[in-house]
Every structure is written in structure tokens, then in C-alpha cells.
């Protein structure tokens, strides 16, 4: 085999791990020696945390799972008075569950699933919120974070999940909701925290979190480091290797003017896993999927990739400058400037069944998918927020302007041979392009070639927006929450292919709003009703994914309008047990209208509709001083009301329809429960149960992944004032289940039983 590969540089994470180890060892020795000489109690410190190896400071008093207010100034009221469903996954939940990635963290939030990536849909995070694709609706500290990524959380303090359409908050997209990742920032205290995690399947993770004040405590520097490598429990050959660094610097702590500078860098080098092929309910050579689930040939550890061919390398670089000034006691002006660049480079095996090899011959075609992509984004966001009194009513407001430029370049590799072979041969046949369903060998020799193909697509987008939010206290028992946003979104895609060049463009303008009325029968509770909208214009993902309203080569899409989503919601929120436990309940209807549908060959119209009726419940916080819980339930009744014709634009099926089918990636029922109990001041035990109903991968409801229940357990023990031990066992029963469904061909299998032991240091 020969291949020419454009590599995204990935430095050795072992060097970073060694550096973390040296720093921790030196710091531990110095502080332990000091502790031996001086046993006087130190001043109170706030919680400090480190992702999966979260370490808390001394005399911790903020380990609750309850969060009272979102970080973004666009939320102009505490969560109990916010008329929409918002779930915040706090640092303590990330620590206790040993989460290391965004997908790990969101397991604790029911109603969210993840879709699988391929070639056109990039590998990485592809969340579905309330049944709607949200891969372009992730924000970092309130600024859209574009580009296909598998996000780490070593530098993340909390994750905010806003459910329901909310284009008034972030602009385009957000049909089902959005995610906001809150970064760790410099603090007004000194600390050094670190952790080593050793686990099954050669898991090794090191983290370091250092914060230091200087300039007479008016400035602070914080540094987060991470090194992570692991194989995957229950999966042959698959491995993940990544490292990251995130320095940040703040000037003006405790003063009216504050300046924050931050940088985030992460690289990964993986042998990726696309999981298992779907089986067919029939052995006929021309069988179509009817109601088929993945098949592993009798061994759930089977891996259908090739070590000699497959790889995935990623990188992310994000630089941010934020300046905040208090104009007076009731008004603050803030400007955030960010430049980000993310990249992916991969060739991976898709266990393909399109030639019916699985059911006819018991074999799998190792189809090669590839991608080389780079996304750059520059955003400037200016916000003015505060509060004032007018006509006897209190206003808590936030208003701002946003300007963003985005560009994505996508190309790939030419992999040959990569045609659709009929694999009527034994494993390793066809030059390694075919393998056995029941006994694949990832070490098979592959007699092919991988060469860089620079033909691809360059997509650019420019957006401009103005927005305003206000919570008006009509009287002590009634609140009115409103939000308005106006966007212009101009995008252009230039395609360079062997058949020639094409140029597509679209200019959209859209207005979104939200309104909610809140009644507070008591100070610690509320009952609300709300309405919110979102808009998804043509090309909203800027080339980073296959979207329902994306550009179509050879078709005029300039006349297509933004897809529109509306949400009606009725809910209630209560803070009980001395305001330490938050309980919420909501019923809602989300309707996506004006969706683009296929009506005939090469003809699309804005005439489709889909709908989700749902119920959500949640609980977060402390039941007693020793016992706390983070739990939720989601019921989603989804329906494709008018999905248009079946088929693709060149091959339209004249008869038949998916009308009335369940929406893909939308479980009817999902449930999560995580709870811990402090048996003694030093010993804590906990556990979790996570249930997800059957999920369809396609609009035709012909392929699906079965429902599953996963159980986790944890125990932590404080060895000393400065050293903790924590044991986590994830997927306690070693359940074989699938956590990502693709519309055809395959589904991703989740990890088996994984044990993790973390030693944490905090000074």
C-alpha cells in the first residue's frame, strides 16, 4: 500500500504528560513539606475543578449539583424565573461521573442523542436536541464554536443546555436548542490542582490546573493542561490519543475594568471506529431495509477497519480577547473578539452493507471515507447589560451587536480501489477491501493507494446581528421576559471538481423572537408560558455537514427561504429543601415549518413540516446535606408531518411517503439519574442509570438501534486534606449498546465496561 497524506501535526502527548507529572510532583513535595511544618487551617477556598479529574479546594462549600443562574448575560433572570427549559451540567457532575468529553457530559441530560458522522457529515460531535440536529449550535462562552470537533472538557467549567428554538440567543439554527460551554477563567486566589487517571484498556489521563495572582492581586494567570490516551473497552484495535493546553490571563480583578486573554489548543491522533453494519431482514440480493438493527457477527468486539489505512487527526486553536467595563453600578459594557481555527484529517473504514454482502455472504465491504477540512471563524460581539427602573418596574436587560466571518475548506483523499465490490470471498479478500462479518482482522494487508485530492468546496459566510433581551418585573409576582434578534446571513460555496467549477450563493435576512410570562406564587417557585422561534437559512452549517437546507450542486437554491421553527411551552420550576434542590417540569410543542422538501426531480420547495410534542422533568441539587441528585426524564412524540417525496433529486420515488414516521435520532423516552451520598465526611459513594429508547437512523424508519439501559458506579475517598482517590466504573454490566445511528450502512457501538481510578492533588 502507498499513500500520500496531509498530516495535521500532532505532538507527543507523552511529553505533555511527563511535564504535568514533574510539575505535580514538585508541587506536591513542596506543599506536603509545608503542611508538615504548618498545620494551621488555611482560609476558605472556592471549588476548583479539572474535568474528569476534578479537584476541589480546601473547605469546599460549593459542590452542589444545583445551578441558580446561567453564565450568559443574555439570560436576564435566575433560572427559576427563566421561561424556558435550561439544564446546566455543573463542574461537580463532570467530576463525579468522570466525564472527559462533551458526549460523556451530555449523557446526563435526557432528550439529547448523537448522530454518526461519515464523509460529508464530518466526524465529531453531532448532537440532536429534542429531535433536531444541533451540530452547528454549540457555543463557547456565548460565541458560536463552528467546525467539526470531538470536544474535550479539561478547560470547561460547566455546560449549559438550552432546549427549544432559540435563534433569538444565537442566530441561525437552534431548532431544537443549543449548547454553551463555559470556560475556566483566572480566579482571585492561588491554587495548584492536578490528577492522574489510570484505567482499564490502557487508559492514562493527566491534568493540571494552576492559578496564580500577581500585580498586588489585581491580575491572575491560569493554566490548564491535559494528556489523554486510551483504548476502548469491548472494541478491538480502536484507540484515542490527545493533548491540550489552555492558558488564560486576566487584568483588573476587583476593578471596574477587566481584560481577559485566553488561548485554547488541542490535538488528537486516533484510530477511529465506525461501529457495526446494519443487517438485513432478508437474504435476497436486492433486499431493502425493513426494520433492521446493527449486526456484529456474533462478537461485539469486532472491528472492521484497517490499521494500515485508517487514521483521524484533529486540531483546534481558539484565541479570545474580552474587555469588560462597569460604566456604573447598574450598567456594564463588554466586547469579545475571537478567532478560531479547527481542522480534521481522516481516512476511516465504513462497514458498508449497500451491496448486501452482510446478508448474502457474511462479509463486509471496507468502504473508505475521507475528509480534510479547515474551518476558521472570526467574531466580534459587543454587549451592554444591566438593570434600571422605569415607571415603577424593574428591567434586567442585555443588548448587543455581533459580526462574524466564517470560512470552511473541505477536500479529501482519493482512495483506490474504493468501488462497491461484491464480497463473495473470505476475509482479507479483494486486496483487504472485504472482510469477514464474524471474524474481521484489522491487521489485514491492504493493497491499495491513498492520495491527496485537492478538489473540494470552499464555503464562506458573513453574518451581522443586533439583539435585545429584557426581563420586566411587572410586580413582585409577575415577570415578562422578551427577546428580539435580527440577522443577515450571506453565504457562498465554490466547488472545484474534475467536472468543472460551480458557484452557489444565498443571502438571507431573518427576525426571531421569544416571549414568556412568569407567575411567582412564592419566591422559590414559578409557573410560566412561553413562545420562541428559530430560523435555519440555506448553507447555515457553512460546509461543515450535510444539512436539510444546504446547497445542492446544479440546483438553484437562491429562492429557498430559511426554515422556521416555533415552540410553545408551559412549565414550572421550584427550589425546595431550603432552596437547595431545583425541580422543573415542562410540556411543549415544537413545529418546524417551511422545511425544504423534494417535490420532483431536481425540484425543491419550502413546504415541509415536522413536529415534536414532549414532556420534560428534571431534578438537581441536594436532598439532604449528604445526598444529592442530578436527574431527568424526556418524552418526545415526534412526527414527520410532511416530509416530501422519497428518494434523491435524480431518482424520485413517485409513490410512497415517510409521512407520519418518527423523526430520526429521536427517542420517545429517555431517562438519566446520577446520585451521590456522603457516607462519612471522607467517603462518598454514587451511581447512575441511563436509559434511551429505540432510535431510528433514517426518515423511513427502516434502520434503528435498540433501546438500552446503562449503569455506572463511583466511590471517592479523601486520603488527606490534599489528596483524594476516586474510582468510577462506567457501563457496570458491560452492556453492548449503540450510541449513534446513521441513516444507512452502520451504527456506532459504545464502550464496554470501563474502570477508572483517579488520584487527585489540590493545594
Give residue ranges: language-model regions:
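Gram-negative outer-membrane beta-barrel transporters
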Residues: 589-591, 606-699, 733, 760-762
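Face-selective signature of the C-terminal outer-membrane beta-barrel domain
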Residues: 319-341, 368-494
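Membrane-embedded beta-barrel scaffold of Gram-negative outer-membrane proteins
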Residues: 323-328, 332-338, 342-348, 527-528, ...
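Structural signature of Gram-negative outer-membrane beta-barrels, strongest in the C-terminal barrel
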Residues: 250-254, 375, 394-396, 400-406, ...
Amino acid at each position: 500500500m502507498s499513500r500520500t497524506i496531509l498530516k495535521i501535526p500532532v505532538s507527543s502527548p507523552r511529553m505533555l504528560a511527563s511535564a504535568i507529572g514533574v510539575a505535580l510532583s514538585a508541587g506536591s513535595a513542596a506543599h506536603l513539606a509545608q503542611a508538615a511544618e504548618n498545620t494551621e487551617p488555611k482560609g476558605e477556598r472556592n471549588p476548583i475543578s479539572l474535568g474528569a479529574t476534578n479537584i476541589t479546594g480546601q473547605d469546599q462549600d460549593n459542590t452542589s449539583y444545583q445551578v441558580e443562574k446561567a453564565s450568559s448575560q443574555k439570560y436576564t433572570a435566575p433560572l427559576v424565573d427563566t421561561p424556558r427549559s435550561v439544564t446546566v451540567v455543573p463542574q461537580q457532575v463532570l467530576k463525579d461521573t468522570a466525564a472527559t468529553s462533551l458526549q460523556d457530559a451530555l449523557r446526563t441530560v435526557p432528550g439529547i442523542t448523537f448522530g454518526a458522522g461519515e464523509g460529508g457529515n464530518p466526524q465529531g460531535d453531532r448532537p440532536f436536541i429534542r429531535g433536531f440536529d444541533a451540530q452547528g449550535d454549540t457555543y463557547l462562552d456565548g460565541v458560536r464554536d463552528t467546525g467539526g470537533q470531538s470536544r474535550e472538557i479539561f478547560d470547561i467549567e460547566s455546560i449549559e443546555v438550552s432546549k427549544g428554538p432559540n435563534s433569538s440567543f444565537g442566530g441561525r439554527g437552534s431548532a431544537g436548542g443549543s449548547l454553551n460551554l463555559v470556560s475556566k477563567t483566572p480566579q482571585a486566589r492561588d491554587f495548584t490542582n492536578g490528577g492522574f487517571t489510570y484505567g482499564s484498556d490502557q487508559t492514562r489521563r493527566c491534568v493540571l490546573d494552576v492559578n496564580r495572582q500577581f500585580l498586588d492581586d489585581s491580575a491572575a494567570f491560569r493554566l490548564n493542561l491535559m494528556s489523554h490516551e486510551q483504548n476502548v473497552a469491548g472494541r478491538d484495535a480502536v484507540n484515542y490519543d490527545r493533548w491540550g493546553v489552555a492558558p488564560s490571563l486576566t487584568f483588573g480583578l476587583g476593578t471596574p475594568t477587566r481584560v481577559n486573554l485566553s488561548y485554547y489548543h488541542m490535538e488528537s491522533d486516533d484510530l477511529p471506529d465506525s461501529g457495526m453494519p446494519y443487517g438485513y431482514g432478508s437474504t435476497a440480493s436486492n433486499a431493502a431495509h425493513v426494520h433492521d438493527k446493527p449486526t456484529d457477527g456474533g462478537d461485539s468486539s469486532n472491528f472492521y477497519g484497517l490499521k494500515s489505512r485508517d487514521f483521524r487527526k484533529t486540531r483546534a486553536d481558539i484565541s479570545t480577547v474580552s474587555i469588560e467595563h462597569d460604566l456604573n453600578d447598574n450598567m456594564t459594557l463588554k466586547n469579545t473578539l475571537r478567532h478560531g481555527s479547527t481542522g480534521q484529517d481522516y481516512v476511516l473504514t465504513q462497514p458498508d452493507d449497500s451491496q448486501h454482502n452482510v446478508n448474502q455472504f457474511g462479509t463486509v465491504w471496507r468502504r473508505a471515507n475521507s475528509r480534510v477540512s479547515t474551518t476558521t471563524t472570526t467574531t466580534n460581539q459587543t454587549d451592554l447589560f444591566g438593570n434600571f427602573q422605569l415607571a415603577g418596574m424593574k428591567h434586567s436587560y442585555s443588548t448587543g451587536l455581533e459580526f462574524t466571518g466564517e470560512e470552511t475548506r473541505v477536500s479529501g483523499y482519493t482512495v483506490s480501489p474504493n468501488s462497491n465490490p461484491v464480497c463473495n470471498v473470505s476475509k482479507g479478500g479483494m486486496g483487504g477491501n472485504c472482510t469477514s462479518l464474524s471474524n474481521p482482522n484489522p491487521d489485514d494487508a491492504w493493497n491499495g493507494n491513498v492520495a491527496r485530492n485537492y478538489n473540494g468546496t470552499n464555503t464562506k459566510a458573513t453574518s451581522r446581528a443586533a439583539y435585545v433581551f429584557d426581563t420586566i418585573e411587572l410586580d413582585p409576582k409577575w415577570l415578562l421576559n422578551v427577546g428580539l434578534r435580527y440577522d443577515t446571513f450571506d453565504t457562498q460555496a465554490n466547488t472545484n471538481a474534475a467536472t468543472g467549477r460551480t458557484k452557489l450563493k444565498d443571502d438571507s435576512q431573518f427576525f426571531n423572537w421569544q416571549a414568556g410570562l412568569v407567575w411567582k406564587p412564592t419566591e422559590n417557585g414559578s409557573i410560566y408560558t412561553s413562545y420562541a422561534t428559530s430560523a435555519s437559512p440555506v448553507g447555515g452549517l457553512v460546509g461543515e455537514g450535510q444539512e436539510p437546507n444546504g446547497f445542492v450542486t446544479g440546483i438553484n437554491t437562491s429562492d429557498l427561504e430559511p426554515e422556521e421553527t416555533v415552540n410553545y411551552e408551559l412549565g414550572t420550576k421550584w427550589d425546595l429543601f431550603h432552596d437547595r434542590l431545583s425541580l422543573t417540569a415542562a410540556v411543549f410543542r415544537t413545529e418546524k415549518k417551511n422545511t425544504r422538501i423534494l417535490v420532483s426531480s431536481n425540484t425543491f420547495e419550502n413546504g415541509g413540516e415536522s413536529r415534536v410534542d414532549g414532556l420534560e422533568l428534571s431534578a438537581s441539587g441536594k436532598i439532604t446535606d449528604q445526598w444529592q441528585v442530578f436527574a431527568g426524564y424526556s418524552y418526545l412524540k415526534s412526527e414527520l408531518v410532511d416530509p416530501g417525496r422519497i428518494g434523491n433529486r435524480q431518482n424520485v420515488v413517485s409513490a410512497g411517503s415517510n409521512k407520519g414516521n418518527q423523526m430520526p435520532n429521536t427517542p420517545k423516552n429517555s431517562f438519566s439519574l446520577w446520585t451521590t451520598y456522603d457516607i462519612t465526611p471522607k467517603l462518598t459513594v454514587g451511581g447512575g442509570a441511563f436509559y434511551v429508547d429505540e432510535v431510528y437512523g433514517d426518515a423511513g424508519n427502516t434502520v434503528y438501534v435498540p433501546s438500552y439501559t446503562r449503569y455506572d458506579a463511583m466511590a471517592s475517598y479523601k486520603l488527606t486534606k490534599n489528596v483524594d482517590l476516586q474510582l468510577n466504573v462506567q457501563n457496570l454490566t458491560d452492556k453492548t449498546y449503540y450510541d449513534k445511528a446513521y441513516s444507512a450502512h452502520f451504527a456506532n457501538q459504545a464502550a464496554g465496561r470501563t474502570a477508572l481510578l483517579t488520584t487527585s492533588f489540590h493545594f
